[in-house]
């Protein structure tokens, strides 16, 4: 069975047991009345079952309802069908004030019907010939308004300065100021030039997201013809069917696939209603993607440390034990489905490098947009500053130093022999994003 954990907030007067049973029925075989065609099938075989309810500590009138769904309810290899069944209609149920899907346990039998990520972590490392450290990226800014040639120039400067990747912003598709084909051509030229000068393999996340699946695949085909290593997709706005189609193309044609989570906070940010991002991540690993944006803990975007660490485990590891302290409701066995690299992006700069290296570890992408392009000396020096800071943190980690305790000292030491890093440290020394998180973990039962 697929197991689901729902956070249920019933309407006043509705018992939690009745609310849990209603969720199970409405998201499987049930309707609002008995119908004569019920007798033509075996409902016991197909109906969802609410097998447990527990109150949420510290919350009034909130409960976690556990529901089991028989596998025969779902089409093989279709995240679209899985979500249509489990969350497609029940969230508008009048008997509930609010409903949130907190977690799913996907059984190995169902996981085996999915291709998953086009390549996975180890294959990407081998393609790039880069090991033992996080990868460095940068989103080109301003995100909208640049011509294709100026955009390509910024890509070249960042890659030449020491970054591994640059990135299209999620809303860069094919607008009047910069059509996709022109952008792809100038970015490919920038990649080739930077590779020739540095001797390193470089990439730019060319956003293939489009209004139709056919147009999306056409853009991916063009990118492959240019010889670039990676393309990009906005998987929530583009949809799971489009994403799975692109992931299959990327595996068949040797392209890495970077995934942006644009629109996720509309779905996952409120604590009592929607779908938790850990569920959207599991769905992405099934649908297919080699990278996905994951918050930063320390940057400008929502994301508690323990919740984010739970996300990272679900993306990268083969087997994850149930751990309510990190928000993981079920033990998950991925049966060797390739892992996904988490991407830390959003309001980060060189002073964050030690914390990011410690939190995300080696198999990650640390992506500095404004933290590269906002350097007072230009794009290439901004890239140099980030590369020097990263190399210093990796060396300190390998020497056994505590990045959480000694992080600022490590950055100061490195800045003594890197004027680019020293300038970056001075510019961003006062930048903080100290806001209370909206989506937090529930207190554990005492």
Curated annotation (Swiss-Prot):
The keyword Lyase applies. The modification N6-carboxylysine is found at residue 167. The record marks 300 as: Transition state stabilizer. Mg(2+) binds at residues 167, 169-170. Keywords: Calvin cycle, Carbon dioxide fixation, Chloroplast, Disulfide bond, Lyase, Magnesium, Metal-binding, Monooxygenase, Oxidoreductase, Photorespiration, Photosynthesis, Plastid. One of its GO terms (molecular function) is magnesium ion binding. Its main location: plastid. Pfam families: RuBisCO_large (PF00016), RuBisCO_large_N (PF02788). Binds 1 Mg(2+) ion per subunit. HAMAP family: RuBisCO_L_type1 (MF_01338). Belongs to the RuBisCO large chain family. Type I subfamily. This is Ribulose bisphosphate carboxylase large chain.
């Amino acid at each position: 069975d697929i197991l689901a954990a729902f956070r249920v907030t019933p309407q006043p007067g509705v018992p939690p047991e009745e609310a849990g049973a209603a969720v199970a029925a409405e998201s499987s075989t049930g309707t609002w009345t008995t119908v004569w065609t019920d007798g033509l099938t075996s409902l016991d075989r197909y109906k969802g079952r609410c097998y447990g309810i527990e109150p949420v500590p510290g919350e009034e009138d909130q409960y976690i309802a556990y529901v089991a769904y028989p596998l025969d309810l779902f089409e093989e290899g279709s995240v679209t069908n899985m979500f249509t069944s489990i969350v497609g209609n029940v969230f508008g149920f009048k008997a509930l004030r609010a409903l949130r899907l907190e977690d799913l346990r996907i059984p190995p039998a169902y996981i085996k019907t999915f291709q998953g990520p086009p390549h996975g972590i180890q294959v990407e490392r081998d393609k790039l010939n880069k090991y033992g450290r996080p990868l460095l990226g940068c989103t080109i800014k301003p995100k909208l308004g640049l011509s294709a040639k100026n955009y390509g120039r910024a890509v070249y400067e960042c890659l030449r300065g020491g970054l591994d990747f640059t990135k299209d912003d999620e809303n860069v598709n094919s607008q009047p100021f910069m059509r996709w084909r022109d952008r792809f051509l100038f970015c490919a030229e920038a990649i080739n030039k930077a590779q020739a000068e540095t001797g390193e393999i470089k990439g730019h996340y060319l956003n293939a997201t489009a209004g139709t699946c056919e147009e999306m695949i056409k853009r991916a085909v063009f990118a492959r013809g240019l010889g670039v290593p990676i393309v990009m997709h906005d998987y929530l706005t583009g949809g799971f069917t489009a994403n799975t189609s692109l992931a299959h193309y990327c595996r068949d044609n040797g392209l890495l696939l970077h995934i942006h989570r644009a629109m996720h906070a509309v779905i996952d940010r409120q604590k009592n209603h929607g779908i938790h991002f850990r569920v959207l991540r599991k769905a992405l690993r099934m649908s297919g993607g080699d990278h996905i944006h994951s918050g930063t803990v320390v940057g400008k975007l929502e994301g508690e440390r323990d919740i984010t660490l739970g996300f990272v485990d679900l993306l990268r590891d083969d087997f994850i034990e149930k751990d309510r302290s990190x928000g993981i409701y079920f033990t998950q066995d991925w049966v060797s489905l390739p892992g996904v690299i988490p991407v830390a992006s959003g309001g980060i700069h060189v002073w964050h490098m030690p914390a990011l290296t410690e939190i995300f570890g080696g198999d990650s992408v640390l992506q500095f947009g404004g933290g590269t392009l906002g350097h007072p000396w230009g794009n290439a020096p901004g890239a140099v500053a980030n590369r020097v800071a990263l190399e210093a943190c990796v060396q300190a980690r390998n020497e056994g130093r505590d990045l959480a305790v000694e992080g600022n000292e490590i950055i100061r030491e490195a800045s003594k022999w890197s004027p680019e890093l020293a300038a970056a440290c001075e510019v961003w020394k006062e930048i903080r994003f100290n806001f209370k998180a909206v989506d937090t973990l529930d207190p554990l039962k005492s």
